Regions:
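Non-heme di-metal
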Residues: 1-209
Length: 209
């Protein structure tokens, strides 16, 4: 579990650095916010790595997924960045971090639980930062939900902004998301963007002699 989250935190650091490189002309206050968030994500990565080491696990002992990088790195604008990273994958972590902090605490691993709890509270601010800039850059006639939904492109869809655990309305409200956005996301169902594997079975086929 910690290895999985460390993988995602490191990818977030790299994507934030990429955003700073890709968008040098973005507003200074936006770039400063990204840099501040990047530093917090570096802390998160360090916390996970240290805790993993204490548990006898090294980074790379398990599979490392490039999925978040492959989905977000093609971003073409700062609005793409906040829509996909801040308001999608970081929003999903409002569910995951809270859920697993509670699970770890119940299981007796208070040290790991505290790490997840601290990260959860940081993620609230990260989602809020993305929401602030979505509201600044979107068409003012659009709702937050419509503007965000329109900005997402396959394979990223709104379902990615929800964890596969309990839906955390409280954390989303603390991040500033409005009730229309929260209820729309709660109801939303779609593919998570993975292409299905198709298999063809030919009952008449025989092994070659």
């Amino acid at each position: 579990l910690l290895h999985f989250f460390a993988n995602h935190e490191l990818l977030a650091v790299e994507l934030m650095a990429l955003a700073l490189l890709k968008f040098p002309d973005a507003p200074d206050s936006f770039r400063k916010g990204v840099l501040y968030t990047l530093k917090e994500e570096q802390n998160h990565t360090r916390w996970y790595l240290k805790r993993m080491e204490e548990c006898g696990v090294k980074f790379g002992d398990y599979h490392l997924s490039p999925m978040i990088w492959s989905h977000i790195s093609p971003m073409e604008s700062p609005l793409d960045y906040v829509s996909t990273l801040s308001l999608t994958f970081e929003q999903a972590n409002l569910d995951y971090a809270k859920h697993y902090s509670e699970i770890l605490a119940q299981s007796g691993d208070q040290k790991s639980a505290r790490i997840l709890s601290k990260i959860y509270h940081d993620e609230i601010a990260h989602v809020g930062h993305g929401l602030k800039w979505l509201r600044r850059w979107k068409e003012q006639s659009q709702s937050d939900w419509d503007a965000w939904h329109k900005q997402l492109h396959f394979p990223v869809s709104p379902i990615r902004a929800k964890g596969k655990v309990a839906f955390n309305e409280e954390g989303r409200r603390l991040a500033g998301l409005d009730e229309n956005f929260i209820s729309s996301l709660r109801r939303h169902q779609s593919s998570r963007g993975r292409s299905p594997d198709l298999y063809y079975f030919n009952p008449d086929a025989e092994p070659a002699a």
